[in-house]
Amino acid sequence: MRSRGFYEWLMTQRKPENADEVQEFANAAFFDSEFPKQSQNFDEISKYLEENAPYLMSMEVFDEAWRRFLASEEEL
């Protein structure tokens, strides 16, 4: 069982300047009041982003963010 949700992890990736694509995603998601903040389900978050996140230029960015999230959870 994961100790924290994806959104909580994503917020640790925010960076105001010189951000990579995942950090830019985090910056934009911060302002998305409808983001499924409590979800830990890849499919649920992915569907939400596909339908409601014009700030995400490519789902590959989400896939990379999810990989980093899973890797960070393995370190805990």
From Swiss-Prot:
SUPFAM superfamilies: YozE-like (SSF140652). Pfam families: YozE_SAM_like. Belongs to the UPF0346 family. This is UPF0346 protein OEOE_1017. It comes from Oenococcus oeni (strain ATCC BAA-331 / PSU-1). The lineage of its organism: Bacteria, Bacillati, Bacillota, Bacilli, Lactobacillales.
